[in-house]
Amino acid sequence: MKTAENIRGTGSDGPRKRGLCVLCGLPAAGKSTFARALAHRLQQEQGWAIGVVAYDDVMPDAFLAGARARPAPSQWKLLRQELLKYLEYFLMAVINGCQMSVPPNRTEAMWEDFITCLKDQDLIFSAAFEAQSCYLLTKTAVSRPLFLVLDDNFYYQSMRYEVYQLARKYSLGFCQLFLDCPLETCLQRNGQRPQALPPETIHLMGRKLEKPNPEKNAWEHNSLTIPSPACASEASLEVTDLLLTALENPVKYAEDNMEQKDTDRIICSTNILHKTDQTLRRIVSQTMKEAKGNQEAFSEMTFKQRWVRANHAAIWRIILGNEHIKCRSAKVGWLQCCRIEKRPLSTG
Protein backbone atom coordinates (compact mmCIF):
# COMPACT_ATOMS: atom_id res chain seq x y z
CA MET A 1 0.00 0.00 0.00
CA LYS A 2 1.22 3.48 -0.86
CA THR A 3 1.95 5.88 1.98
CA ALA A 4 1.71 9.63 2.27
CA GLU A 5 5.50 9.88 2.57
CA ASN A 6 5.87 8.37 -0.91
CA ILE A 7 3.73 11.13 -2.35
CA ARG A 8 4.47 14.24 -0.30
CA GLY A 9 8.16 14.69 -1.09
CA THR A 10 10.07 17.94 -1.33
CA GLY A 11 10.98 20.33 -4.09
CA SER A 12 14.10 18.33 -5.00
CA ASP A 13 12.18 15.10 -5.47
CA GLY A 14 10.95 16.00 -8.93
CA PRO A 15 7.67 17.33 -10.24
CA ARG A 16 4.70 17.56 -7.93
CA LYS A 17 2.06 14.91 -8.33
CA ARG A 18 -1.40 15.98 -9.41
CA GLY A 19 -4.65 14.17 -10.03
CA LEU A 20 -8.30 14.43 -10.99
CA CYS A 21 -11.01 12.59 -9.07
CA VAL A 22 -14.51 12.19 -10.50
CA LEU A 23 -17.12 12.04 -7.73
CA CYS A 24 -20.35 10.78 -9.26
CA GLY A 25 -23.80 9.61 -8.23
CA LEU A 26 -27.45 10.58 -8.34
CA PRO A 27 -28.64 14.02 -7.15
CA ALA A 28 -28.93 14.15 -3.34
CA ALA A 29 -26.76 11.04 -2.96
CA GLY A 30 -24.56 12.95 -0.50
CA LYS A 31 -21.71 13.81 -2.86
CA SER A 32 -21.11 17.38 -1.67
CA THR A 33 -21.08 16.38 2.00
CA PHE A 34 -18.75 13.50 1.19
CA ALA A 35 -16.46 15.77 -0.87
CA ARG A 36 -16.09 18.34 1.92
CA ALA A 37 -15.29 15.66 4.48
CA LEU A 38 -12.83 14.00 2.10
CA ALA A 39 -11.04 17.28 1.36
CA HIS A 40 -10.70 18.12 5.05
CA ARG A 41 -9.38 14.66 5.91
CA LEU A 42 -6.82 14.60 3.08
CA GLN A 43 -5.57 18.07 3.95
CA GLN A 44 -5.12 17.09 7.59
CA GLU A 45 -3.81 13.55 7.18
CA GLN A 46 -1.88 13.74 3.90
CA GLY A 47 -1.00 17.42 3.69
CA TRP A 48 -2.34 17.66 0.14
CA ALA A 49 -3.80 20.64 -1.66
CA ILE A 50 -7.42 19.75 -2.44
CA GLY A 51 -9.79 21.62 -4.70
CA VAL A 52 -13.44 20.55 -4.74
CA VAL A 53 -15.24 21.83 -7.82
CA ALA A 54 -18.98 21.32 -7.30
CA TYR A 55 -20.67 21.77 -10.66
CA ASP A 56 -23.93 22.88 -9.01
CA ASP A 57 -22.10 25.74 -7.28
CA VAL A 58 -20.15 26.91 -10.33
CA MET A 59 -22.60 26.46 -13.20
CA PRO A 60 -26.15 27.48 -12.15
CA ASP A 61 -25.70 31.24 -11.79
CA ALA A 62 -24.36 31.32 -15.34
CA PHE A 63 -27.72 30.51 -16.87
CA LEU A 64 -30.52 30.28 -14.33
CA ALA A 65 -33.28 32.78 -14.98
CA GLY A 66 -35.46 31.25 -12.30
CA ALA A 67 -35.08 28.93 -9.36
CA ARG A 68 -36.01 25.80 -11.33
CA ALA A 69 -34.77 26.83 -14.78
CA ARG A 70 -32.63 24.36 -16.67
CA PRO A 71 -30.70 24.76 -19.95
CA ALA A 72 -31.35 22.67 -23.03
CA PRO A 73 -29.27 19.45 -23.20
CA SER A 74 -27.05 20.88 -25.95
CA GLN A 75 -26.43 24.06 -23.94
CA TRP A 76 -25.74 22.03 -20.81
CA LYS A 77 -23.12 19.99 -22.65
CA LEU A 78 -21.41 23.14 -23.92
CA LEU A 79 -21.32 24.58 -20.39
CA ARG A 80 -19.76 21.38 -19.03
CA GLN A 81 -17.08 21.50 -21.72
CA GLU A 82 -16.47 25.16 -20.95
CA LEU A 83 -15.95 24.35 -17.27
CA LEU A 84 -13.43 21.67 -18.23
CA LYS A 85 -11.61 24.33 -20.24
CA TYR A 86 -11.42 26.51 -17.11
CA LEU A 87 -9.95 23.56 -15.21
CA GLU A 88 -7.40 23.12 -17.98
CA TYR A 89 -6.33 26.77 -17.66
CA PHE A 90 -5.77 26.25 -13.95
CA LEU A 91 -3.85 23.00 -14.50
CA MET A 92 -1.61 24.61 -17.11
CA ALA A 93 -0.73 27.34 -14.62
CA VAL A 94 0.08 24.75 -11.93
CA ILE A 95 2.15 22.57 -14.26
CA ASN A 96 4.09 25.48 -15.76
CA GLY A 97 4.42 27.39 -12.49
CA CYS A 98 2.98 30.59 -13.93
CA GLN A 99 -0.02 32.84 -13.48
CA MET A 100 -3.43 31.66 -14.64
CA SER A 101 -4.60 33.44 -17.73
CA VAL A 102 -8.19 34.39 -18.50
CA PRO A 103 -9.93 32.49 -21.33
CA PRO A 104 -10.76 34.83 -24.22
CA ASN A 105 -14.16 33.20 -24.76
CA ARG A 106 -16.00 32.61 -21.52
CA THR A 107 -19.34 32.84 -19.77
CA GLU A 108 -18.54 35.66 -17.39
CA ALA A 109 -20.83 34.58 -14.54
CA MET A 110 -19.56 30.99 -14.62
CA TRP A 111 -15.94 32.11 -14.83
CA GLU A 112 -16.39 34.34 -11.78
CA ASP A 113 -17.96 31.48 -9.82
CA PHE A 114 -15.05 29.24 -10.82
CA ILE A 115 -12.52 31.83 -9.66
CA THR A 116 -14.38 32.23 -6.36
CA CYS A 117 -14.34 28.45 -5.91
CA LEU A 118 -10.54 28.32 -6.26
CA LYS A 119 -9.97 31.39 -4.09
CA ASP A 120 -12.11 30.04 -1.26
CA GLN A 121 -9.93 26.91 -1.17
CA ASP A 122 -6.64 28.85 -1.09
CA LEU A 123 -5.50 27.80 -4.55
CA ILE A 124 -5.28 31.22 -6.29
CA PHE A 125 -5.40 34.92 -5.49
CA SER A 126 -5.98 38.01 -7.61
CA ALA A 127 -3.28 40.38 -8.77
CA ALA A 128 -2.94 43.18 -11.30
CA PHE A 129 -0.09 43.67 -13.74
CA GLU A 130 -0.04 46.56 -16.20
CA ALA A 131 -3.71 47.29 -15.50
CA GLN A 132 -4.69 43.73 -16.45
CA SER A 133 -6.29 41.30 -14.03
CA CYS A 134 -4.65 37.93 -13.55
CA TYR A 135 -4.59 35.17 -10.99
CA LEU A 136 -1.53 33.87 -9.18
CA LEU A 137 -1.15 30.47 -7.59
CA THR A 138 -0.88 30.22 -3.84
CA LYS A 139 1.99 28.47 -2.10
CA THR A 140 -0.42 25.68 -1.21
CA ALA A 141 -1.23 25.01 -4.87
CA VAL A 142 2.40 24.79 -6.00
CA SER A 143 4.17 23.24 -3.02
CA ARG A 144 2.01 20.18 -2.32
CA PRO A 145 0.51 17.25 -4.20
CA LEU A 146 -2.72 18.51 -5.74
CA PHE A 147 -6.01 16.71 -6.24
CA LEU A 148 -9.05 18.26 -7.88
CA VAL A 149 -12.31 16.55 -6.91
CA LEU A 150 -15.06 17.14 -9.47
CA ASP A 151 -18.45 16.83 -7.80
CA ASP A 152 -21.31 16.17 -10.22
CA ASN A 153 -23.79 13.52 -11.29
CA PHE A 154 -21.62 12.31 -14.21
CA TYR A 155 -24.35 9.79 -14.96
CA TYR A 156 -23.11 9.15 -18.50
CA GLN A 157 -19.81 7.34 -19.02
CA SER A 158 -18.97 9.84 -21.77
CA MET A 159 -19.08 12.69 -19.24
CA ARG A 160 -16.47 10.98 -17.09
CA TYR A 161 -14.37 10.07 -20.11
CA GLU A 162 -13.94 13.77 -20.93
CA VAL A 163 -12.27 14.21 -17.53
CA TYR A 164 -10.09 11.16 -18.19
CA GLN A 165 -8.99 12.71 -21.50
CA LEU A 166 -7.93 15.85 -19.63
CA ALA A 167 -5.91 13.72 -17.19
CA ARG A 168 -4.29 11.88 -20.08
CA LYS A 169 -3.43 15.12 -21.89
CA TYR A 170 -1.36 16.36 -18.93
CA SER A 171 -0.27 12.98 -17.49
CA LEU A 172 -2.28 13.38 -14.29
CA GLY A 173 -3.55 10.77 -11.90
CA PHE A 174 -7.17 9.78 -12.48
CA CYS A 175 -9.73 7.95 -10.36
CA GLN A 176 -13.47 7.71 -9.80
CA LEU A 177 -15.63 7.53 -6.68
CA PHE A 178 -19.22 6.43 -7.15
CA LEU A 179 -21.72 6.99 -4.32
CA ASP A 180 -24.29 4.24 -4.80
CA CYS A 181 -27.19 5.66 -2.82
CA PRO A 182 -30.69 4.10 -3.06
CA LEU A 183 -33.06 6.01 -5.33
CA GLU A 184 -35.68 6.32 -2.57
CA THR A 185 -33.15 7.99 -0.25
CA CYS A 186 -32.14 10.44 -2.97
CA LEU A 187 -35.77 11.35 -3.63
CA GLN A 188 -36.42 11.90 0.07
CA ARG A 189 -33.38 14.15 0.51
CA ASN A 190 -34.13 16.05 -2.68
CA GLY A 191 -37.63 16.85 -1.40
CA GLN A 192 -36.10 18.59 1.63
CA ARG A 193 -33.97 20.95 -0.47
CA PRO A 194 -34.99 24.60 -1.01
CA GLN A 195 -34.50 24.25 -4.78
CA ALA A 196 -35.50 20.63 -5.27
CA LEU A 197 -35.29 18.95 -8.63
CA PRO A 198 -38.49 17.48 -10.07
CA PRO A 199 -38.74 13.84 -8.89
CA GLU A 200 -39.11 12.69 -12.51
CA THR A 201 -35.67 14.16 -13.26
CA ILE A 202 -34.05 11.96 -10.62
CA HIS A 203 -36.03 8.93 -11.81
CA LEU A 204 -34.81 9.59 -15.35
CA MET A 205 -31.19 9.90 -14.21
CA GLY A 206 -31.56 6.67 -12.26
CA ARG A 207 -32.63 4.86 -15.42
CA LYS A 208 -29.89 6.40 -17.55
CA LEU A 209 -27.11 6.09 -14.97
CA GLU A 210 -24.03 4.32 -16.33
CA LYS A 211 -22.02 3.15 -13.34
CA PRO A 212 -18.23 2.87 -13.57
CA ASN A 213 -17.40 -0.43 -15.25
CA PRO A 214 -13.67 -1.28 -14.98
CA GLU A 215 -14.21 -4.69 -16.60
CA LYS A 216 -15.57 -3.08 -19.76
CA ASN A 217 -13.59 0.17 -19.82
CA ALA A 218 -9.87 -0.14 -19.06
CA TRP A 219 -9.63 3.60 -18.35
CA GLU A 220 -12.04 3.14 -15.39
CA HIS A 221 -9.81 0.66 -13.54
CA ASN A 222 -9.11 3.19 -10.76
CA SER A 223 -12.70 3.24 -9.53
CA LEU A 224 -14.34 2.62 -6.18
CA THR A 225 -18.04 2.17 -5.46
CA ILE A 226 -19.20 3.20 -2.00
CA PRO A 227 -22.49 1.39 -1.26
CA SER A 228 -24.10 4.31 0.58
CA PRO A 229 -23.05 7.54 2.29
CA ALA A 230 -23.48 5.78 5.62
CA CYS A 231 -20.49 3.60 4.70
CA ALA A 232 -18.30 6.54 3.63
CA SER A 233 -16.32 6.65 6.88
CA GLU A 234 -15.73 2.90 6.77
CA ALA A 235 -14.36 3.21 3.24
CA SER A 236 -11.93 6.02 4.11
CA LEU A 237 -8.86 3.78 3.95
CA GLU A 238 -9.91 2.39 0.57
CA VAL A 239 -10.54 5.90 -0.74
CA THR A 240 -7.14 7.13 0.42
CA ASP A 241 -5.42 4.13 -1.13
CA LEU A 242 -7.25 4.73 -4.41
CA LEU A 243 -6.13 8.37 -4.53
CA LEU A 244 -2.55 7.46 -3.62
CA THR A 245 -2.49 4.83 -6.36
CA ALA A 246 -3.81 7.34 -8.88
CA LEU A 247 -1.11 9.88 -7.98
CA GLU A 248 1.61 7.26 -8.21
CA ASN A 249 0.36 6.00 -11.58
CA PRO A 250 -0.58 8.98 -13.75
CA VAL A 251 -2.27 8.35 -17.05
CA LYS A 252 0.31 8.28 -19.83
CA TYR A 253 -0.35 10.56 -22.78
CA ALA A 254 0.39 7.78 -25.28
CA GLU A 255 -2.09 5.41 -23.67
CA ASP A 256 -5.59 5.09 -25.09
CA ASN A 257 -8.60 2.96 -24.38
CA MET A 258 -8.62 -0.50 -25.93
CA GLU A 259 -11.77 0.20 -27.93
CA GLN A 260 -10.09 3.09 -29.73
CA LYS A 261 -7.03 0.95 -30.47
CA ASP A 262 -9.23 -1.77 -31.92
CA THR A 263 -11.04 0.80 -34.05
CA ASP A 264 -7.73 2.13 -35.36
CA ARG A 265 -6.59 -1.39 -36.23
CA ILE A 266 -9.80 -2.06 -38.15
CA ILE A 267 -9.45 1.19 -40.08
CA CYS A 268 -5.82 0.40 -40.87
CA SER A 269 -6.65 -3.14 -41.99
CA THR A 270 -9.51 -1.90 -44.14
CA ASN A 271 -7.23 0.59 -45.87
CA ILE A 272 -4.61 -2.10 -46.55
CA LEU A 273 -7.23 -4.49 -47.93
CA HIS A 274 -8.66 -1.79 -50.16
CA LYS A 275 -5.25 -0.95 -51.60
CA THR A 276 -4.37 -4.63 -52.07
CA ASP A 277 -7.68 -5.29 -53.78
CA GLN A 278 -7.08 -2.41 -56.19
CA THR A 279 -3.58 -3.73 -56.95
CA LEU A 280 -4.86 -7.26 -57.67
CA ARG A 281 -7.58 -5.97 -59.95
CA ARG A 282 -5.07 -3.83 -61.85
CA ILE A 283 -2.69 -6.80 -62.32
CA VAL A 284 -5.48 -9.08 -63.59
CA SER A 285 -6.75 -6.40 -65.96
CA GLN A 286 -3.28 -5.74 -67.38
CA THR A 287 -2.58 -9.46 -67.81
CA MET A 288 -5.86 -9.94 -69.67
CA LYS A 289 -4.98 -7.15 -72.08
CA GLU A 290 -1.59 -8.69 -72.81
CA ALA A 291 -3.12 -12.14 -73.45
CA LYS A 292 -5.75 -11.00 -75.95
CA GLY A 293 -3.30 -11.40 -78.87
CA ASN A 294 -2.96 -15.11 -78.17
CA GLN A 295 -6.29 -16.98 -78.28
CA GLU A 296 -4.99 -19.98 -76.31
CA ALA A 297 -3.42 -17.80 -73.69
CA PHE A 298 -6.54 -15.63 -73.64
CA SER A 299 -8.79 -18.67 -73.02
CA GLU A 300 -6.52 -19.80 -70.22
CA MET A 301 -6.53 -16.32 -68.69
CA THR A 302 -10.32 -16.14 -68.95
CA PHE A 303 -10.51 -19.33 -66.91
CA LYS A 304 -8.01 -17.96 -64.42
CA GLN A 305 -10.01 -14.76 -64.06
CA ARG A 306 -13.17 -16.77 -63.36
CA TRP A 307 -11.26 -18.82 -60.81
CA VAL A 308 -10.00 -15.68 -59.03
CA ARG A 309 -13.52 -14.28 -58.86
CA ALA A 310 -14.96 -17.58 -57.60
CA ASN A 311 -12.31 -17.89 -54.90
CA HIS A 312 -12.05 -14.22 -53.98
CA ALA A 313 -12.87 -14.89 -50.32
CA ALA A 314 -10.30 -17.70 -50.12
CA ILE A 315 -7.59 -15.42 -51.48
CA TRP A 316 -8.34 -12.86 -48.77
CA ARG A 317 -8.22 -15.58 -46.14
CA ILE A 318 -4.69 -16.32 -47.28
CA ILE A 319 -3.71 -12.66 -47.14
CA LEU A 320 -5.31 -12.04 -43.74
CA GLY A 321 -4.95 -15.30 -41.88
CA ASN A 322 -2.41 -17.31 -43.90
CA GLU A 323 -4.95 -20.15 -44.06
CA HIS A 324 -5.11 -23.17 -46.33
CA ILE A 325 -6.81 -22.56 -49.67
CA LYS A 326 -10.39 -23.82 -49.68
CA CYS A 327 -11.40 -23.65 -53.32
CA ARG A 328 -14.92 -24.07 -54.57
CA SER A 329 -13.51 -24.93 -58.03
CA ALA A 330 -12.50 -28.50 -58.75
CA LYS A 331 -9.97 -27.38 -61.37
CA VAL A 332 -6.82 -27.49 -59.27
CA GLY A 333 -4.71 -27.20 -62.38
CA TRP A 334 -4.92 -23.45 -61.95
CA LEU A 335 -3.10 -23.74 -58.65
CA GLN A 336 -0.34 -25.73 -60.24
CA CYS A 337 0.13 -23.45 -63.23
CA CYS A 338 0.23 -20.45 -60.91
CA ARG A 339 2.68 -22.36 -58.68
CA ILE A 340 0.54 -21.87 -55.61
CA GLU A 341 0.80 -24.85 -53.31
CA LYS A 342 -1.96 -25.98 -50.99
CA ARG A 343 -0.13 -25.02 -47.81
CA PRO A 344 0.22 -21.86 -45.70
CA LEU A 345 2.07 -19.13 -47.55
CA SER A 346 5.53 -18.25 -46.35
CA THR A 347 5.77 -15.13 -44.24
CA GLY A 348 9.34 -14.55 -45.34
From Swiss-Prot:
<keyword id="KW-0547">Nucleotide-binding</keyword>
<dbReference type="GO" id="GO:0000049">
    <property type="term" value="F:tRNA binding"/>
</dbReference>
<dbReference type="InterPro" id="IPR052648">
    <property type="entry name" value="Ser-tRNA(Sec)_kinase"/>
</dbReference>
<keyword id="KW-0460">Magnesium</keyword>
<dbReference type="InterPro" id="IPR020028">
    <property type="entry name" value="L-seryl-tRNA_Sec_kinase_euk"/>
</dbReference>
<dbReference type="GO" id="GO:0005524">
    <property type="term" value="F:ATP binding"/>
</dbReference>
<dbReference type="InterPro" id="IPR013641">
    <property type="entry name" value="KTI12/PSTK"/>
</dbReference>
<dbReference type="Pfam" id="PF08433">
    <property type="entry name" value="KTI12"/>
</dbReference>
<keyword id="KW-0067">ATP-binding</keyword>
<comment type="pathway">
    <text>Aminoacyl-tRNA biosynthesis; selenocysteinyl-tRNA(Sec) biosynthesis; selenocysteinyl-tRNA(Sec) from L-seryl-tRNA(Sec) (archaeal/eukaryal route): step 1/2.</text>
</comment>
<feature type="binding site">
    <location>
        <begin position="25"/>
        <end position="32"/>
    </location>
    <ligand>
        <name>ATP</name>
    </ligand>
</feature>
<protein>
    <recommendedName>
        <fullName>L-seryl-tRNA(Sec) kinase</fullName>
        <ecNumber>2.7.1.164</ecNumber>
    </recommendedName>
</protein>
<keyword id="KW-0808">Transferase</keyword>
<comment type="function">
    <text>Specifically phosphorylates seryl-tRNA(Sec) to O-phosphoseryl-tRNA(Sec), an activated intermediate for selenocysteine biosynthesis.</text>
</comment>
<comment type="similarity">
    <text>Belongs to the L-seryl-tRNA(Sec) kinase family.</text>
</comment>
<dbReference type="GO" id="GO:0016301">
    <property type="term" value="F:kinase activity"/>
</dbReference>
<dbReference type="GO" id="GO:0006412">
    <property type="term" value="P:translation"/>
</dbReference>
<keyword id="KW-0648">Protein biosynthesis</keyword>
<dbReference type="InterPro" id="IPR027417">
    <property type="entry name" value="P-loop_NTPase"/>
</dbReference>
<keyword id="KW-0418">Kinase</keyword>
<dbReference type="GO" id="GO:0043915">
    <property type="term" value="F:L-seryl-tRNA(Sec) kinase activity"/>
</dbReference>
